[in-house]
Swiss-Prot record:
The keyword Amino-acid biosynthesis applies. It catalyses: 1-(5-phospho-beta-D-ribosyl)-5'-AMP + H2O = 1-(5-phospho-beta-D-ribosyl)-5-[(5-phospho-beta-D-ribosylamino)methylideneamino]imidazole-4-carboxamide. Mg(2+) binds at residues 77, 79, 81. It is found in: Cytoplasm. Pathway: Amino-acid biosynthesis; L-histidine biosynthesis; L-histidine from 5-phospho-alpha-D-ribose 1-diphosphate: step 3/9. The gene is hisI1. This is Phosphoribosyl-AMP cyclohydrolase 1.
Amino acid sequence: MKDWLDQIKWDADGLVPAIAQDHKTGRVLMMAWMNREALSLTAAENRAIYWSRSRGKLWRKGEESGHVQKLHEMRLDCDADVIILMVEQIGDIACHTGRHSCFYRVYEDGEWKTVEPVLKDPHAIYSAGH
């Protein structure tokens, strides 16, 4: 049997996009990147672990903010090039801006409008020493 990680179509940088979705509501929370190690650890630890392209290292979601994503289910799309993580978002905040979702802007009347409130000031989140 082929290794489950080998069935994924990784991009040229060895990454695959991962969409985090609320396991109860189905709402999209965020999108991030995963490499083989991040995906393997996500499955092993039952929590979302991503690859930070800007920092060049593994990023355990919630390691600084406390806003961990507990894994309930992983799905692979029909082309095997996108992962969906069905998660429980601890603390109800997925976005580094302090909002529930990173998708808090809607296109309306020719512009992007903010439609979701900040639930917690990002400075308070990231200076709390989690």
